[in-house]
Amino acid sequence: MSVVRWPRVLTPSLLSQILKKQKNPVTALKLFEEAKERFPSYGHNGSVYATMIDILGKSNRVLEMKYVIERMKEDSCECKDSVFASVIRTFSRAGRLEDAISLFKSLHEFNCVNWSLSFDTLLQEMVKESELEAACHIFRKYCYGWEVNSRITALNLLMKVLCQVNRSDLASQVFQEMNYQGCYPDRDSYRILMKGFCLEGKLEEATHLLYSMFWRISQKGSGEDIVVYRILLDALCDAGEVDDAIEILGKILRKGLKAPKRCYHHIEAGHWESSSEGIERVKRLLTETLIRGAIPCLDSYSAMATDLFEEGKLVEGEEVLLAMRSKGFEPTPFIYGAKVKALCRAGKLKEAVSVINKEMMQGHCLPTVGVYNVLIKGLCDDGKSMEAVGYLKKMSKQVSCVANEETYQTLVDGLCRDGQFLEASQVMEEMLIKSHFPGVETYHMMIKGLCDMDRRYEAVMWLEEMVSQDMVPESSVWKALAESVCFCAIDVVEILEHLISSKR
């Protein structure tokens, strides 16, 4: 029987709204099927299929998702490339990379004219699973097709993989061949190859690469360029070639940044300490000089700050924030997120909390769900999941900041790891109400934890919820429940009645 009040006239947008409101993905699929029976003149479009596929993918219901994808192919409705990219990620996450490859190879059977995002996503997932040879085969076979209208992301990925296995020589060949592929190296291309050269100690090649930037892509004072320049300068300093680094800095300031002379920092060649502390000091001075030489703009400061924070260079990153504020720019949520992440990695949780509670408020910048998620993960990883729950409550009171699946999943996993199963149960209940679906492992962890706490009725309720979603509990879950029954006078018949009624 239907669980919704159907409208007199059904449209795809109305059905999408109905499906999104369903707590159970199985129920959503039944309504999806029922729609055509109730409304003979109605037809699903690409948007409805995308909604249904997204719901099934997020709940890891791979078989049902494959069924809906097959239906979408039969209906021949227009499909977005982003839908297939999402499905490819879902297949990979479920350990079914072969299904992802098979789907991509069959895209010509769907009404989809652009495969660029799916192509890039598949290659990324194959590289992640160390399927390098197969990824190269896919690249060679499909990179020239008209469906893939941009190859720069795939080529950058190929260069990155080659550099990771210390084959910057091959990555350099890919870089040089880009023009023949109908694309042009971007800053990411230069950054990847520069890092590859420097990691292998090929500083001469890295220097020539930097010079080529001056006339190929560099813009006056661009902070995005500084990210690449700094890789070489740091590598030269680490190799003890500080004098060369200072000389190249001068060329960067004159040709790359075209900075005024007042921005030149007084670092004289030969006047530096050869100790590790001395070299680190020179590196900091070089970075400060680059920051001063950049043309003040939000994009430049953002690129420099996030790059430094990603490398864990908190002091230098903070100097960028001070510089941008002095020029009248305020850090964005993206920059704050990078700073919070760096602080959490460094174990400085108090400072990370202060960024959200104090620094962002003073800068009149409201935290986004992304910033909150970074802090919540940092707190949970440090065993402070109960403190992290407070930020879920804080998000609910903030306008236009809605907790997403990552928020809930991180909190539930963190609370369970800390043995806070009752609190985890409450968060997971809210998670389901918001139509975010935990995975099988989360249910297993929750049920076994509640049994260990002698909270059998709550455990049974989650088992009932699990079974209602057609999930099959593993043997250890049944064992935990059986042991709980044996040690306490709980009615076994009552448990069975719960499970039987949930399947009706």
Curated annotation (Swiss-Prot):
Q: Where are the PPR repeats?
A: 45-79, 80-114, 115-145, 151-185, 186-216, 225-259, 260-296, 297-331, 332-367, 368-398, 404-438, 439-473
Task: Tell whether Repeat is among the UniProt keywords.
Answer: yes
**Gene3D superfamilies on file:** Tetratricopeptide repeat domain (1.25.40.10)
User: Pfam families, from UniProt?
Assistant: PPR (PF01535), PPR_1 (PF12854), PPR_2 (PF13041)
Q: What is this protein called?
A: Pentatricopeptide repeat-containing protein At1g05600
Keywords annotated in UniProt: Repeat
| InterPro entries (alphabetical) | Pentatricopeptide_rpt, TPR-like_helical_dom_sf
Domain of life according to the entry? Eukaryota
Family classification: Belongs to the PPR family. P subfamily.
